[in-house]
Amino acid sequence: MDEYLKTLLEQIRCKKARPYVKQEFQDHIEDQIEANMQAGMDREQAEREAVRDMGDPVETGISLDSVHRPQVAWKLLGIIVLISIAGVLIHAGIAGKISENAAAGSDRYVFHVVIGLAVMMILYLLDYTVLARFSKIIAVILLFACLVTLLGGYQLNGARYFIVLPGGRGISMQTLMLFYVPIYGAILYKYHGWGYKGLMRAIIWMLAPLILVYTMPALMTACVMLVSMLVMLTIAIQKNWFTVRKKKAICGIWAGFLAMPVAAFLIRYLSSSLTEYQIARLQAIFSGGGEKDSFTGMLHSFWQQNKWIGKSGSDVMGNLPAFNADYILTYLSSVYGTIAVILLCCVLAVLIFAVFNTAMRQKNQLGMMMGCGCGIVFLINIFINILENLGIFPQSVTFLPFLSAGGSCIIVSYGLMGIVLSTYRYKNIYPRHLKIGFKFDKTKAKKALYVSKMSMCIWTGGTVVVMCVAIYWDLCKSYMNIPFKIVTIVLTLLLVGNMRKIVQYNETNR
């Protein structure tokens, strides 16, 4: 049997598929051996007959090699190329018509698309199971970056959205946090087979980014993330990832999370903690008057003046803010006609269908969940952006994936698509379920324990030093410097993490 499996696996070029193919054939041969032994054969004869029934290993291996190999989603790539070309032409036209300041983002659209394509290819070639293996670490990094943005990010209109990089370029943290959604899918998969304890941990991983993003405040992004992760959690419960009562769990989670925003608003309203600007916005939304109504009226007038084909007489570029970003559809309808916008929306609809079709046809449950997460983010953003352009949805911070100006929006869109392409690439390689935890090599146990002890000592000393410096700073400046607080918290968490690893190691090696 070993010689047969060795010859068969030599024909399969994809090394990632070999362990799963070997396990599948080995189990099949073992079952056949058991059946032959029950028929009266001895072990050696039963194994020989079972291997003979499997056929020629070379021919079988070659046929398996044609199936178990990386795949390319040519249809998805074709749609992405089409949308990218359309975006380049649109923003090249915008940048050529008006000044650099007025066309902020359009003049750098090609540069951002190139970076986005590079990110997409990196994530496409990178196995999505690698992201899943380090999903909790990636999630913590995103949460930490969001916290840093809240404490020391660039402030714009009373909100802290951006981390300013050297050279004056900024990263929109509220947009970057959309990467958390597919990562959350991998975190959900790590609790596969758990009960209510795992479900509560999954909810905690959902709440953490929502609180930080809402505090920015980026209400629209928080709502997009909330709905996306709730749908993913619902899918996980429905597919029996958690050993819980499905109907009660799903109804309880949705009821709780839908009631939370209402409760939060009532608390802030009754405690008079809402700002005058927020009160004015709410009054405008519910009463149909004020600044919001005039803006919506302007959008309606633009659409009423549009032609089916060709340019209208509306001065969209001069009157509409963010016409090349949030309201790109309104601009396109005024310049190229309503038919052009309808065709573009149809292309985006085909893209969304292709993404969900790719995700739902995944045999591997991890790839299915991560792909669905990306598709949900695309769907919600496109849907809200269309409604906002039509004046149906209140004015908010949105973007049209792949087409709105803004480096962060473009790069995040291509990055999410890279994850979808990666799940398709390995769809015929991985089985239905995977083990994505860290592998522990027992031969290196002593060295790992020594390193853990040394790191614990280093982090302990570092924590003490930082706390002493912070106390000294507090005495000198009469306040605690926020960066020292952050460093102290991080060092303490790392210290606790190392101590936990040592305890786990001692428990498993008694």
Each language-model region and where it sits:
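Soluble N-terminal domains of membrane-associated systems
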Residues: 1-77, 81
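A structural signal for hydrophobic alpha-helical transmembrane segments in multi-pass membrane proteins
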Residues: 48-157, 205-206, 355, 375, ...
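Transmembrane alpha-helical segments and their membrane-water interfaces
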Residues: 105-134, 171, 177-193, 231-241, ...
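Hydrophobic alpha-helical transmembrane segments
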Residues: 111-119, 334-355
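A juxtamembrane structural motif centered on a specific transmembrane helix
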Residues: 194, 392, 398-471, 489-510
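Hydrophobic alpha-helical segments of polytopic membrane proteins
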Residues: 201-208, 220-268
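Hydrophobic, glycine- and aromatic-enriched re-entrant/interface helices and adjoining loop segments
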Residues: 246-343
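Loop-to-helix entry and N-terminal half of a specific, functionally important transmembrane alpha helix
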Residues: 359-397, 403
